[in-house]
């Protein structure tokens, strides 16, 4: 037997090398490729032998693998020709070979706001101090960030009052290869750091875990930053800044550069994070969904979750278009963005008359006399002779006359697609304008506007009032007032337009996003001494204000870390369930959460709703989406039994894909939400769910009865069987069925609703969506 195996391997080596040599002599495009070979073998033998064989053969042909994956999964990345890639894809043990694509990053008060949201919902926890709750459990929880690196000297990452590094930590602190490698140091807070370079981007300056973009530093401080007093952005948003889990440890995996984040580096970071012993992985980036076996985040997160690591991802910044969600595999927690109740007021005084005050918002740190009045014009009146009037109204580049704009405040419209606010303000500034007033009812994100230039944003109805004033006087003047931050008076949360929307492009039978969290104008730590981030005439900031689902993701990562520290035995699915079923759907005024344009938000906008801090710590019941659910998902999605057995090494004996299944069956995995696709109304659809009692023994509610309530739209009939669930003890599991039917032949629109189980103390809510569309119905 051994002799036969040796002959087989020798023949394969000869054949492989001969074809590789032939590929060299033929004209073929080349590039970086990822070779994914499924799960890492439990005993380090067979599967890894395939990896070693292929990678060693490549080396013999002069091809050195950039990365080898061996801890959480098997595979490698290498520079190959197309022919070589096609050849390797046909070899035993290879699941997929795909180009090494570039992923893009999805780029204080937020935690105080979430605390208030929790208090409104969770009376049991209103007596508990936030800091005390944080310090009770979190010291041994490790959050791994796959991002642009970290600035270790930032105040958020000091290790005051931190205990010894947890014994479970198996990672390292790479100091880099720069001229002063000792300048990067870890501590008891920042316990580990790694960096990854690919053949695409080799730069000695980036051979370090240090952050040169600010993104990784910002998100890490949101999730796990220490408590910092008197934090502010040049006096704005001042107060105590803290991470969601300030006692958790941080491990940074710098997989991103100025150009983006290489998929091969992302997989290498996943592989190391799994081996290092992190509890939570936070990822604020994404790749457009196309194929689960060619998505580094779907692959890496599957193997991380398989080992009990919770993976939290941003939903993307491609909204408000439908089917624009990123990172929507069911083993991930997918996070949308929402607003908080803090606003940055920058009002406009018309004609020096205090009775003509227009409410605006913006962040202005300009070094000019903010009490002085300047001439006010609408951009239309500054149009170049040969410019398009609509483009000029919107302050598009090269459409305005500099001689007219110079020294004035310019009112710009915002009713053209693909018009970035910064382009408009940059154009007015370039032409010598004093400031810009933008008429826009959708823009909430102020982070991309140059704060050294006077900019304020107003609502369309206020724009009409300004135009009325301009037309009523021969010499209109205005003053843009100094910015001041105010909390508590803004309607919040709402869903900003940039946050990506469901349904999931690859299948409508899973509801994504899962949850929403603050992601607009978030204050957090920044690079120390970064002059590129400093407004004109100001010193570099210690903290910066950023927006995006990149900022939403670490809010949930911090909460996930809190839950893991409080309940070490909880699985990633239990943590996700607790976060989702305790979410809120109401604003701080008691109205339903809306989108940025004022429309009622749906689960396609915010999933289960807005995350709360304390609610997930006591959810009552949880939906345990187990490993078998994920294997069935792969089977329902279309993978074969042989493929699934390569993807996972935790396959039950006798496993086979369910016969005659399809993607519609994905609705039956034990997820905290329900999504029914291809609903024709002629016949009912039935799904089942199982819940586990995790009530607190301290309250004495182990023996408890939950009763269901249903919120369903007109035209959709929803029945739940049984309507009561009687749990005898903690850990009991009970199942129920949900039957959907319709009073009409076909649903005209997607139907949204919810199912809530309540025992008088806990409300366990699951959103649902029912649609007549199937996976072939694209809305893009």
Swiss-Prot record:
Listed InterPro entries: Peptidase_S8/S53_dom (IPR000209), Peptidase_S8/S53_dom_sf (IPR036852), Peptidase_S8_His-AS (IPR022398), Peptidase_S8_Ser-AS (IPR023828), Peptidase_S8_subtilisin-rel (IPR015500), Peptidases_S8_3 (IPR034197), S8pro/Inhibitor_I9 (IPR010259), S8pro/Inhibitor_I9_sf (IPR037045)
Family annotation (SUPFAM superfamilies): Protease propeptides/inhibitors, Subtilisin-like
GO biological process, one term: proteolysis
All residue ranges annotated as the Peptidase S8 domain in the record: 110-617
A Pfam family: Peptidase_S8
Coiled-coil positions: none
Source organism, top-level taxon: Eukaryota
Domain called Inhibitor I9: residue spans: 33-106
Pro-sequence residue ranges: 26-106
The protein, known as: Subtilisin-like protease SBT5.1
Active-site feature positions: 147, 215, 550
Record localization: Secreted
UniProt GO cellular component terms: extracellular region
PROSITE patterns the UniProt entry points to: SUBTILASE, SUBTILASE_HIS, SUBTILASE_SER
MF-aspect GO terms: serine-type endopeptidase activity
Domain PA as annotated: residue spans: 385-469
Family per similarity comment: Belongs to the peptidase S8 family.
Main location: secreted
EC numbers: 3.4.21.-
């Amino acid at each position: 037997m051994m002799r036969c195996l040796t002959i087989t391997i020798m023949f394969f080596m000869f054949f492989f090398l001969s074809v590789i040599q032939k590929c060299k002599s033929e004209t073929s495009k080349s590039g970086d490729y990822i070779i994914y070979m499924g799960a890492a073998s439990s005993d380090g033998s067979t599967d890894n032998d395939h990896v070693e064989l292929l990678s060693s053969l490549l080396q013999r042909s002069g091809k050195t693998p950039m990365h080898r994956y061996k801890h959480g999964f098997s595979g490698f990345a290498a520079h190959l020709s197309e022919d070589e890639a096609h050849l390797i894809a046909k070899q035993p043990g290879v699941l997929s070979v795909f180009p090494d694509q570039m992923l893009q990053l999805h780029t204080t008060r937020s935690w105080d706001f979430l605390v208030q949201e929790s208090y409104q919902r969770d009376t049991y926890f209103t007596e508990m101090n936030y800091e005390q709750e944080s310090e009770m459990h979190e010291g041994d929880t490790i959050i791994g960030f796959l991002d642009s690196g970290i600035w270790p000297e930032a105040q958020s990452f000091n290790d005051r009052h931190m205990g010894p590094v947890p014994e479970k930590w198996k990672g390292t602190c790479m100091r880099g290869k720069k001229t002063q490698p000792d300048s990067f140091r870890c501590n008891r807070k920042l316990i580990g750091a790694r960096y990854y370079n690919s053949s695409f981007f080799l730069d000695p300056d980036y051979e370090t875990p240090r952050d040169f973009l600010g993104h990784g530093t910002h998100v890490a401080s949101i999730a796990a930053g220490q408590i910092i007093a008197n934090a502010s952005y040049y006096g704005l948003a001042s107060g105590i800044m803290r991470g969601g889990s300030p006692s958790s440890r941080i491990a940074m995996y710098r997989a991103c550069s100025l150009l983006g984040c290489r998929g091969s580096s992302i997989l290498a970071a996943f592989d190391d994070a799994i081996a290092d012993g992190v509890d939570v992985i936070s990822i604020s980036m994404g790749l457009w969904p196309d194929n689960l076996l060619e998505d580094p985040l779907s692959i890496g997160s599957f193997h991380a979750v398989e080992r009990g690591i919770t993976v939290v991802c941003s939903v993307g910044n491609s909204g408000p278009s439908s089917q624009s969600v990123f990172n929507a595999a069911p083993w991930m927690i997918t996070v949308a963005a929402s607003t908080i109740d803090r606003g940055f007021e920058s009002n406009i005084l018309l004609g020096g008359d205090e009775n003509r005050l227009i409410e605006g918002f913006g962040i202005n740190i300009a070094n000019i006399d903010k009490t002085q009045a300047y001439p006010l014009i609408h951009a239309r009146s500054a149009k170049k002779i040969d410019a398009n009037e609509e483009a000029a109204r919107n302050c598009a580049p090269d459409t305005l006359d500099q001689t007219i704009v110079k020294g004035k405040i310019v009112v710009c419209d915002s009713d053209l697609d693909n018009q970035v606010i910064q382009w408009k303000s940059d154009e007015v500034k370039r032409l010598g304008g004093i400031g810009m007033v933008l008429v826009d009812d959708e823009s909430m994100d102020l982070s991309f506007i140059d704060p050294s230039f006077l900019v304020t944003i107003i609502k369309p109805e206020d724009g009409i009032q300004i135009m009325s004033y301009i037309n009523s006087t021969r010499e209109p003047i205005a003053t843009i007032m100094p910015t001041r931050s105010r909390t508590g008076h803004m309607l919040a949360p709402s869903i900003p337009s940039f946050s990506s929307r469901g349904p999931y492009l690859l299948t409508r039978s899973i509801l994504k996003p899962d949850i929403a969290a603050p992601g607009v104008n978030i204050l957090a730590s920044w690079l120390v001494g970064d002059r590129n981030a400093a407004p004109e005439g100001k010193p570099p900031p210690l903290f910066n204000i950023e927006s995006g689902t990149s900022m939403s993701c670490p809010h949930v990562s911090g909460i996930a870390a809190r839950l893991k520290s409080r309940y070490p035995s909880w699985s990633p699915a239990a943590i996700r369930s607790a976060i989702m079923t305790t979410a809120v759907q109401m604003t701080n005024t008691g109205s339903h959460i809306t989108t940025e344009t004022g429309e009622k938000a749906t689960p396609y906008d915010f999933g289960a709703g807005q995350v709360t801090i304390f609610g997930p710590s006591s959810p009552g019941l949880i939906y345990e989406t187990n490993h078998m659910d994920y294997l069935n998902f792969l089977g329902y999605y279309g993978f074969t039994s042989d493929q699934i057995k390569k993807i996972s090494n935790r396959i039950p004996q006798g496993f086979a894909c369910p016969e005659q299944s399809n993607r519609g069956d994905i609705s039956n995995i034990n997820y905290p939400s329900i999504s029914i696709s291809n609903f024709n109304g002629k016949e009912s659809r039935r799904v089942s769910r199982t819940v586990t009692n995790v009530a607190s023994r301290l309250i004495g509610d182990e023996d408890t009865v939950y009763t269901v309530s249903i919120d369903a739209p007109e035209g959709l009939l929803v029945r739940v069987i049984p309507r009561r669930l009687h749990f005898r003890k903690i850990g009991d599991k009970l199942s129920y069925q949900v039957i959907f039917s319709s009073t009409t032949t076909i649903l005209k629109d997607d139907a949204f609703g919810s199912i809530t189980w309540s025992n008088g103390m806990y409300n366990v809510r699951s959103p649902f969506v029912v649609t007549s569309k199937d996976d072939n119905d694209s809305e893009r």
